[in-house]
């Protein structure tokens, strides 16, 4: 029998319009369900359901809302963060931690796959990630305006390939982001490559430390066991090795023009974001470089 709290949480976090609007019913066979059901308890689902989607909050606020002790809510939020169901950051005036209930992609699906022990134990999480990187776009892509409206990833050209005679915006340069987040760099295993490996698919890419986390997301990854800190020089070595292997640099595109949380180094045969641009022609128009001519 399906667990109703997991059904409710899957519906809350999904980007699939028919399910979000209640036009179709979420079932045990849907990825939103089986991806969460294997790792989220009913008590954890209660806390997540008390949170607003993509709106930072604190254990104190949720505890008051639920009528529960702060220590109880704090532990559950930390456990969900370790599992990858929640994110947290320190983007507050006083640098205190705030928690976020994310959407699945980009968000919880990647983070759940970055918990290597968890996804090895529950390989259905890999399939859940693959499906959630595809299914929502089958309905929403035709409605996406030029620029992407925050959906997906943004391709960054190899810096030396930008002609010196062109005026290019600073965000088109990897160096801009490394400088902006100097001292706040981390690296973790690629969730796409890991998911494809576990599904027995992809292009045989090695599972390696290729996803560079920046800002307080780097701290989140380190504190929850999903990555480690790196220096500016090590980041440059990872980027150089990626270019030598023909990988594509991509940055996150969900938080506005001058804020990112990751620099990914993607292989066409394993990256779900690059796959999307091949499957959905409309998607290409908002993945192109913003280099000014």
Where are these regions (language model features)?
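A short, conserved structural fragment
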Residues: 81-92
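Short helix-coil-helix linker/hinge
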Residues: 39-45
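Long, Pro/Ser/Thr-rich low-complexity/intrinsically disordered regulatory tracts in eukaryotic proteins
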Residues: 123-230, 252-256
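Ferredoxin-like iron-sulfur electron-transfer modules
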Residues: 38, 68, 99-101, 252-258, ...
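Long, low-complexity, charged/polar intrinsically disordered regions in eukaryotic proteins
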Residues: 1-33
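Short amphipathic alpha-helical interaction segments
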Residues: 66-82
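Short acidic, hydrophobic short linear motifs in intrinsically disordered regions
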Residues: 54-66
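Short, amphipathic alpha-helical interaction segments positioned at domain boundaries
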Residues: 94-135
